[in-house]
């Protein structure tokens, strides 16, 4: 009986693979951020702006201060979104742009990947500008709060004028996984005119700590105005540090 079934089984497999071969096209690859978009699709604050999945929350009360654009590191969206309630109390609408896996894979110093880097920079800058413009109300401040590699790329884009400078910039554990790129980033941050709050976790990972130290040293050397570095004992300190800094800037 088994011998009789074997030819039928082989014939069936041959038809299956023959059909696939005739199709001549492989199954389309799932985009790297496909599952991320699916994870956030059902959230109450999830919406679409310009056909892109974002998280958006309006400010509390009648006092509107501006728009806080949140740029989380890869797989850190939930962590950064926790700041929404505190920012809303200050009068900020909050807009979170879901990160791209490319931001952790690409390095500005990698000459062999320059085309991919240029394409990513252009796409990232366009997303930030376009989605931010769609949600910013007239007369409000634009606050850019970026984390990890998103922070490094955002500061890099602002310095190269590919991204219009916000009214203020908050970096949270900003870094590239390359010392040369971090040194270049430190000079760019020091030379930029945008007011910058540079937050980093005191017990954080090696790359963010090295990158933060480079920015502090370069900003002191350049006598950068409106630059404030601060070591966080805990991420829960972040809202209070942002509020104190905005008070210093005269926003609240």
Predicted regions and their residues:
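Bacterial N-terminal signal peptides that target proteins for export
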Residues: 1-9
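N-terminal cap/lid segment of alpha/beta-hydrolase-fold proteins
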Residues: 24-62
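Serine-hydrolase catalytic machinery in alpha/beta-hydrolase-like enzymes
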Residues: 53-55, 60-135
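Primarily recognizes the serine-hydrolase "nucleophile elbow" in alpha/beta-hydrolase
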Residues: 133-191
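Catalytic active-site module of serine/aspartate enzymes centered on a nucleophile-bearing elbow/loop
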Residues: 234-252
């Amino acid at each position: 009986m088994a011998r009789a079934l074997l030819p039928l089984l082989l014939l069936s497999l041959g038809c299956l693979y023959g059909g696939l071969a005739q199709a001549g096209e492989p199954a389309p690859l799932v985009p790297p951020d496909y599952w991320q978009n699916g994870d956030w699709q059902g959230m109450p604050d999830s919406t679409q702006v310009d056909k892109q999945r974002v998280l958006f929350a309006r400010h509390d009360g009648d006092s509107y201060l501006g728009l806080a654009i949140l740029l989380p590191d890869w797989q850190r969206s939930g962590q950064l979104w926790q700041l929404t309630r505190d920012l809303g109390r200050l009068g900020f609408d909050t807009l979170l742009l879901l990160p791209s896996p490319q931001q952790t894979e690409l390095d500005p110093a990698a000459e062999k990947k320059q085309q991919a880097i240029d394409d990513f920079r252009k796409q990232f800058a366009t997303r930030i500008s376009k989605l931010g413009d769609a949600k910013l109300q007239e007369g409000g401040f634009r606050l850019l709060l970026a984390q990890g590699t998103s922070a490094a790329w955002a500061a890099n884009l602002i310095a190269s004028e590919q991204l219009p400078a916000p009214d203020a910039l908050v970096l949270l554990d900003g870094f590239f996984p390359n010392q040369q790129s971090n040194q270049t980033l430190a000079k760019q941050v020091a030379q930029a005119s945008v007011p910058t709050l540079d937050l980093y976790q005191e017990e954080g990972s090696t790359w963010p700590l090295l990158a933060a130290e480079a920015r502090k040293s370069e900003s002191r050397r350049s006598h950068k105005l409106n630059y404030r570095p601060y070591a966080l004992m805990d991420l829960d300190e972040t809202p209070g540090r942002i509020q104190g800094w905005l008070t210093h800037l005269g926003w609240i």
